[in-house]
Amino acid sequence: MEKQNLKNTEVNLIYGVDDDLDLPKKVLFGLQHIFAAFGGIIVVPLVIATSLGFDSKVTTALISASILGSGLATIIQAKGVGKVGARVACIMGTDFTFVSPAISVGSVLGLPGIIGATILGSLFEVILSFFIKPLMKFFPPLVTGTVVALIGLTLLPVSIDWAAGGAGSANYASLENLAVAMFVLVITLLLNNYGKGMISSASILIGIVVGYIVCIPLGLVDFTPVKEASWLSFPKILEFGVTFDAKAVMAFIPAYFVATIGTVGCLKAIGETSNIDIGDKRVAAGVLSDGVGSALGGLVGSCPNTSFSQNIGIISLTKVASRHVAVMAGILLVILGFLPKVAAIITGIPNPVLGGVGIMMFGTVAAAGIRTLSNIKLTERNLLIIAISMGLGLGVTFRPDVIHNLPEAIRMIFSSGISTGTIAALILNAVLKESPTSMEFENMYDEEKKAS
């Protein structure tokens, strides 16, 4: 059993990590996770397919395969198979970290090259998982709290873009979009705070459904993709072939390294919101699951899979940390991988609706990190580590062009604000030592606390 966190950091959960629920509740809570993650699951293959000029048949197959691969990887991560899987409520999908290398490889070797690099590159993450234990000593609460806060803060701009209608949309920041987003935010907030039982726990799902319905008469829902989508689709193993190339694999290695760092941070964050201490064995099992899930994803024709940070906030808001809910979400994703028409309905959720719930979800993740940091002694050294790590992580997030002139391999590693902030926190925590003045202040603080 994993030991529980300190009481002052605990979340008042309705269902713990290993608590099972009846089927209707698992489906209901599982759908909430799917709605939060679905946009991220399909947008990466869509961006890759569009950038490489794939035809509609290949694009549709790639998206269906990504949904199926995400479901399989989620089931393995949440349920666990032997030593594989962290066995927590973790949703899996393809991260934007893999977009650049996939386009680079695909422009030369096509989709078979991407699939080959995905499968062989996953072995790097599998190997890396066996070295997690000695690395975990570099992740004290100071580092994990900073990383968790960064996960939420770096995702908030995404939710704001959603609320405005989506980055690059013709009606960006229109009053209609903002009104819908604020309406959904208020509905979700009221249900979560004042609702009882299932109403409170299902507040995100209810908010999305209500927002979706409101958007239909406003003309914000396009049902064309639903009409055009087929009812059934059966992704095939290596349907478009596979090409193994050493250079292609090397292009994916930095992205897999960044994904590993992100997974460690996500699992730690899930631990914080689930009232468990995610130990090194569980983290190693989670990273191993990333590698296995990516290999499976490649086999069914999708890109690598890694943990999705946007689902962490759902645990805090719904007070449901059950991994069985995540398993159900994985099962539903697998089913959706075979039902393009149903998947298209979910894909059609308007951006302002996602923005309304996203602001609440991602803000909750940031607050969880701040709560962790509030339980450590904020000495001058610790404040410096938090400040610089946050500054660099948010700086890269808000001004991504600042690393434009770096070599491609280095640029890939620091392209994510989460990875940049995490690396900074790890290095600073290892290098910076407490000054004599800070240590003296800390001793005085301890004595005063004991005296009181």
From Swiss-Prot:
The chain crosses the membrane at residues 34-54, 58-78, 83-103, 108-128, 138-158, 172-192, 201-221, 250-270, 326-346, 348-368, 383-403, 412-432. The keyword Transport applies. GO terms for cellular component: plasma membrane. Its main location: membrane. One of its GO terms (molecular function) is xanthine transmembrane transporter activity. It is found in: Cell membrane. It is a multi-pass membrane protein. InterPro entries: NCS2 (IPR006043), UacT-like (IPR017588), Xan_ur_permease (IPR006042). Keywords: Cell membrane, Membrane, Transmembrane, Transmembrane helix, Transport. Disulfide bonds: none annotated. It holds the Pfam family Xan_ur_permease. Belongs to the nucleobase:cation symporter-2 (NCS2) (TC 2.A.40) family. PANTHER family: PURINE PERMEASE C1399.01C-RELATED (PTHR42810:SF2). This is Putative purine permease CPE0397. It comes from Clostridium perfringens (strain 13 / Type A).
